[in-house]
Structures are given as structure tokens and as C-alpha cells.
Amino acid sequence: MSGRASSELLLVGSLPAQSTDEALRAGAELFGDLLFALPDGETGPRAAWVGYERERLVRPNPDVDVVSETVSPTGIPRHAYETPVFKIRPGLAAELHFDAWPRIDDAIASYGEFRALRDEGVIPAGLRFQVGLPFPSSALNGFKADFAGDYPVAERAFEDLVGRELVRLLDGIPAAELAIQWDMAYEVQDIEGVLAWTSEGAWERFAGPVARLTPQIPEEVMVGYHLCYGTFPEWPMYEARDYDVLVRMANYAVANSGRTVDWVHMAGPRYLRSEDKRFFRPLTDLEVGDTRVYLGIVLPIDGIAGLRRRHATASRYLDDFGVAMYCGFGRQPGADGTQTMREHAEVVRALREPA
């Protein structure tokens, strides 16, 4: 493997911590020698992933109407059918416009904490700062009322926003210290055909932004893709038949990003399919060159024995890969965050030893 990402582990994004400082300190202590980049844990409002975009980006836009609110008694959606529904305001004379992306403000602020901890020696020198950014279909998942009419307009506005905000992100974080991960869950489910509110064109909703957005990121920045089936409210939102869809998406992303793709992360199966050769067999069709592949086969329920089973099955079809959780693991109810992270690190390190 001659690419820039060669580490054993990828932290997908969210961590079970209460603050950025706590996440960065724990991440550095427990995983520092296993990683090429460290995320800020996506704590606070960002723990809801694209719920953050629904509430902080889309809802405040004066040209967006709220068609319906969540029916959840707590006011917090419990699943995808309980999220607020949005529609572009009728009679909008011009294109939709988003002024700024609050997630970029958070990333720049978190980098300040990252840099301070690195200067103190808490974070190992050489680790990049990892920023996860949702792809358009995921960020704009609330436009359900008239998806066919509204989504293309919202997508253009969002892509314009991303182009402007990537410039601002790079003004705040040195390119050589940055790793950007495009996060996709709704895109994957859209291609699988399980989102009832979407329309024709699922593949293009993934492929178009790959070719339009990723080339805007300078080569000095490391870039990866996280391909996932979602954890809202539980893993997985939809159980895939096999790795075929994610392999096709990974191949396309690497071939059409207009620049180096340093890594791809592909979520794995449930534990009962740890030795299901049919699930893993499409890995033989991966054509990603030096791009580092991380398989999301670390599960919190069956420890090193389960990871070894899945690793052995995957190794029948793929020679060299790193591992990760199937998604971020900042939203595991009832689990002690520090212990969850400690167990995660122990399981991955145990993979170094012979079975």
C-alpha cells in the first residue's frame, strides 16, 4: 500500500464524549498510534448528524417552508419518518441560496482546540485533523414534500454553499493538516431504492456531486468517502444483501473525483453474517488502486472473536484493508463513553496478534 492513508483504524466521526476537548483527548490517548487523522467527535448538536443541517441550515432559510413538524412527543425525531418536512417557498423568484454553513464554523473552532492540544503534546505530531461533511442527499433529506421539484433546486444551492465554504475551511485550517471525509447514508439508501419519498435519479444524486465537489478540494488535503447504511435510530437502517452497492460507489468515487481519493470506508454486516461469503464476495470487484479501504466490521457486541471472524471472511476477497466501526459510535445509548472507546481500541489492537 503506497497511498497516504495506511493506518490500521479509521474513526468514522462521532465519538461518545461530551465535548470537543474530551473527544480529542480521549481519541489521542486511546487511538493515536492507530490513526492517520483524528476527528473532533461531532459532539453537541452535531451528534444528531444531518439533524444539524435540518435545524441549523435548512430551517432558518427564509425561502424554505416547514410543511410538518416531528410528531415525536419529545420533539426529537425517533426515526426517518418523524423528521420535519420542508418545501421551498412557492413563488420563489430566484434560486435558493444558503449564506453560510454552521458546520464549517464548528470545524474551524475545533481545529483551534486540536492545534492547542497538539502543541501541548497531547495529540501526536503528524496526525491530521479530520472533518466529516455530509453529501447533498444526506444534508437535504428534509425536502420530502415535493422531492422531485425541490431537491434539484436545493442541491444546486447546497453545492454552491459547499464550494464557498470549502474556501473558508481552508482559510482556517492548513491543507497539509486537514483530512475531509464525505459522509453518505441517505445516498446509499437512495441507490438501494428504500427511500419512499425520493424520485428517479438516485445514482446521479450520488455521482454528480462526486464529480462536481471533490475536485474543488486541493490535492494537499486528504480526502475520503464514508459509505453507510445509517444508524437512525439503530444499525442498520436497511440491511444490505451484500457489498455490491458500496463497491460500485467506491469504484465510481475513486475514478471520478478528479483528484486522489485517500480512503473509502464501507460499512459491514450484522454479526450473524460474519462468515457469510456471499456478503463479502463483491469485494473482489473493487478497483481503487492505492486508495486505502476501511471495512466497517468492528461491532460493539462480539469483541475480538467477532472481528476476527469478519476479518477472516473479508480476507478471502480483499488482501489489504484497515478496519473501523460501521459508522460513528457517538450515539450508543446506555453505554459508558470512555469504556466504549477503550474497548474499541483494545479490539483493534488485538487484531495484531495471531488468533
Regions found by a protein language model. Give the residues of each.
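Active-site-proximal, glycine-rich beta->alpha crossover segments in alpha/beta enzymes
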Residues: 76-174, 179-205
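Active-site-proximal beta-alpha loop/turn segments in soluble metabolic enzymes
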Residues: 137-148, 183-199, 224-239, 265-269, ...
